[in-house]
Each structure stands twice: as C-alpha cells, then as structure tokens.
C-alpha cells in the first residue's frame, strides 16, 4: 500500500472518530434532560446562557441583568448546558434544563419561598402559578395558565419519565440552528389575534400550525437582533407566499417615529400597485365577500385600484388608552370620486353606506363600524372616529420627512411602550422607554427584528 493511501485512510479514520466523538459528547451531555420536553410543544427555544454571559461580560445585557441576578451559580442549575424554553399545545410556558447539584437547587428554591414535596422519585416545587420538578440530573419548570389548570403535576412527572422517542418533535429542527438564542415554532404559537387573521388569509384546509418559523437572536447592550425564516410543507401555502412576493413591492423609504404625531404607537409600511393588490385580495374568500358587500354601496374596487405607491397603516393610542387605526395610501388617480353621486347615502344602522361631509371628506359605515376617509395631496386617508385629530396633521408630517431607505417589502415600527406590558415586570423596567422595535420582511419568507 502506498504512503499516500495510508495517509488518506488515516485522515478518513480521524475524521470519522472526530464526528463520532462529537456525536457522543452531544448525546451524553444533552439526552438526559432533552427527553423531558413534552411531545405537544408548538414553540421551542434554546438558550446558551454561558455564551450570552461571555459575549457581554464587560457590559450588562438584558439577559445577564434580569436572569443571572435571579439565578446565579448558587441555584444548582447547570448553565454550561443550554436551557430549553417552550410553549405547549395548551399555550403554557415552560423551561427544561440540566441540574448541577440537586441539593443546592432545593435549598435555593426553599429560600425563595417555594413549597417542596416528593412526587414519585422527583422533587416537586410550587410557588403561585410556577411549578418545578427536578431530580439529580434535570429540571422541568412550567407556568400554570390559571388555578383551574388541573393535572399539571401528573403532566410534569409523566414528561420527566418519558423516553426520548416520545419527546418534542421540534428538537431536531432547532439542532440545525446556530446562535446564542434560537427558536423554532409553529405559527399557531403566535398571539390569538394574529392566528385569527392567518385563518382568514390561509388557503382552504391549511392552518397556522402548517407554518414553521425558525429564528436566531443575538443580544447586544440594551438591544437585540433576530433573523428569521418562514417555511411550510404545504404546497398551497407556498403558492400564497409566492403571490405575496409578486404583489408587494420594496418599500424603498419609510417615515420614522420622529417625523409624525407622538400619539402613534406603531406603523406598518407597504408599497403596492392597487390593481395587483385587488387581485390578491379577491383570492382570499372572506375578503372577496367583504368587497362584494362594500361594492353594493361604494366603489371599493375602483378605490383600491387607484392606489399606487407607499401605504402606511398607523395605530394611534389616544389619551383614553384605546387603539385606533389610520391608513394612508398614495393615489395614482381619484377617478373613483367621479361616481360619488351614485353611492348609496342611506346610513341605516347596521348597513353599509356613506355620508358626504365635503367634496373630499366622507364617513363610511361598514360592518357596524364607522370610518372617516378623505383625499389630501393625492393621498387617501382612512381613519377610525377617534383618530380625526391625529389624521389632520399626519399627511403633512409624512411629506416633510425624507424617510429612511430600505428594500424590504414590509417594515413595521412599534414603540417599546406599546408592547412592554406583554412582558414580565422586571423586563418592562429594564429597557429604555424611547426604544423602537423594527420588524422587516425582505420577502414573504425572510424577516428580521431589531431594537433601535
């Protein structure tokens, strides 16, 4: 055998042994607690605590400030192994991780007012709605939805005893992602308001659970950036995503919060050609029916077809605390106003109709809701009743702004104050209140979220 062949064979054997050792290390360090993950998980995130701390050891981050101050190395939790946070099918939130010292963990929980009992071969700790079960190797924590959420202890013990084959199906997907903080979720893990909207838009016989979202997040000092991807095994959903790409054009420029009314809590920026968007809207059965109803009173099809250019959807938070919508769209023409005298002016409660307030200002009643719309400077503005004062100066502010350049098909800005109530109190107070969350879609399948 030649010397070269011996070298090649030796190299192949070395590579094989390296992969085998890595696989052995992965299994030996992880399988003893990953098997605890419930089989009905709809969202799963992996958190490399040690990497997050190393990355920010010279400056405090959201994670190190909130998490490590509460759970130091005296907790008995093994932070050199990743933590896995999840949402199950009942929308309960939980965490799974490795235990470095069960006695230390038990002492830590006792000092923090947890009630600890034995359940089978495990320690069961409870405090209000938080339940935590652990042994010498692993722990499993979960938040009860309410006091009526019964059977939680049996559910947790069953998960602690299950085999790896019965555990979370999303685990293999998250293993393909790199990052300090990674996430895999089915779209039915999103808030109810979003899944309800998706049910309307998605093709027949498809559901939010048929969409998978994967993302990786990196934390920086007082902010973060998340890169994400949307995918589906359903052919009809992929066709819908392709139609979205063909319908929505790059935004090019968008107005920042600095240039508009301070009562605005969030903005969605789009760029559409009205005729193409109308065809897309008609492909959605519920939207098509709504358009048919509107067209019995006003020329909704012609109004939509007249749009060409930037479209912005504003959510204004009034002093009363209620949220209200404003839509502003650039018009190619105002031809739909030619037939204004033919629009039905019968405003009987519960019907669809309109009231002419001036030559270019109107009130529409549709689906038991009132809206005002006006034409200003070749733009269409549609607003809910409480937003009239906000709408008055909005168009001028938008036109006076140079805008920020982008090539994304959708840009959404959200003020931190508008979402911080969704988080637990320690995180609410940590980040500065003048922050803005920016969500951008480069196409229908790729997005990023960052804090500015």
What does each model-identified segment do?
Residues 8-20, 159-279, 407-452:
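Leucine-rich, highly hydrophobic segment in Treponema pallidum outer-membrane-associated proteins
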Residues 16-35:
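Membrane-interface motif at the C-terminal end of an N-terminal transmembrane signal
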Residues 32-33, 235-259, 371-374, 382-400:
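Interface amphipathic segments
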Residues 33-43:
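Membrane-proximal juxtamembrane linkers immediately C-terminal to transmembrane helices
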Residues 42-66:
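Short extracytoplasmic
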Residues 45, 75-177, 305-410:
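Single conserved position on a long alpha-helix in the C-terminal lobe of the eukaryotic protein kinase
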Residues 252-310, 317-321, 332-337:
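Extended non-catalytic domains of envelope/secretory-pathway proteins
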């Amino acid at each position: 055998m030649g010397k070269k062949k011996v070298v090649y064979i030796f190299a192949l054997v070395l590579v094989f042994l390296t992969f085998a050792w890595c696989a052995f290390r992965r299994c030996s360090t992880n399988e003893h607690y990953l098997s605890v993950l419930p089989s009905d998980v709809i969202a799963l995130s992996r958190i490399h605590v040690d990497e997050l701390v190393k990355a920010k050891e010279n400056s405090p981050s959201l994670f190190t400030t909130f998490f490590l101050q509460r759970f130091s190395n005296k907790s008995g939790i093994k932070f050199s192994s990743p933590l896995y946070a999840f949402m199950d099918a009942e929308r309960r939130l939980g965490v799974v991780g490795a235990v470095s010292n069960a006695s230390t963990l038990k002492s830590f929980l006792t000092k923090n007012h947890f009630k600890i009992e034995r359940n089978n071969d495990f320690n069961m700790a409870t405090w209000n709605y938080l339940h935590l079960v652990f042994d010498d190797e692993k722990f499993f924590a979960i938040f009860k939805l309410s006091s009526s959420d019964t059977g939680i202890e049996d559910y947790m013990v069953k998960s602690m005893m299950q085999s790896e084959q019965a555990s979370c199906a999303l685990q293999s997907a998250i293993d393909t992602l790199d990052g300090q903080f990674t996430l895999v979720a089915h779209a039915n893990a999103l808030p109810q308001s979003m899944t309800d909207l998706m049910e309307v838009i998605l093709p027949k016989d498809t559901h939010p659970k048929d969409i998978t979202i994967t993302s990786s997040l990196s934390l920086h000092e007082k902010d973060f950036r998340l890169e994400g991807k949307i995918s589906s095994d359903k052919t009809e959903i992929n066709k819908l995503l392709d139609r979205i790409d063909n319908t929505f054009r790059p935004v090019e420029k968008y107005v920042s919060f600095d240039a508009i009314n301070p009562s605005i809590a969030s903005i969605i920026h789009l760029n559409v050609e009205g005729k193409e968007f109308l065809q897309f809207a008609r492909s959605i059965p519920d939207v098509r029916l709504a358009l048919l109803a509107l067209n019995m009173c006003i020329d909704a099809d012609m109004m939509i077809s007249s749009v060409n250019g930037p479209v912005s959807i504003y959510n204004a938070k009034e002093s009363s605390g209620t949220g209200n919508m404003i839509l502003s769209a650039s018009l190619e023409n105002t031809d739909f106003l030619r037939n204004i005298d033919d629009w039905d002016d019968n405003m009987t409660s519960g019907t669809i109709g309109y009231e002419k307030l001036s030559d270019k200002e109107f009130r529409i009643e549709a689906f038991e809701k009132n809206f005002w719309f006006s034409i200003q400077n070749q733009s269409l503005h549609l607003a809910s009743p409480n937003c009239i004062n906000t709408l008055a100066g909005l168009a001028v502010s938008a036109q006076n702004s140079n805008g920020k350049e982008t090539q994304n098909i959708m840009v959404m800005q959200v003020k931190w104050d508008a979402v911080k109530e969704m988080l637990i109190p320690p995180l609410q107070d940590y980040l500065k209140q003048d922050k803005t969350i920016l969500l951008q879609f480069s196409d229908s399948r790729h997005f990023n979220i960052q804090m500015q």
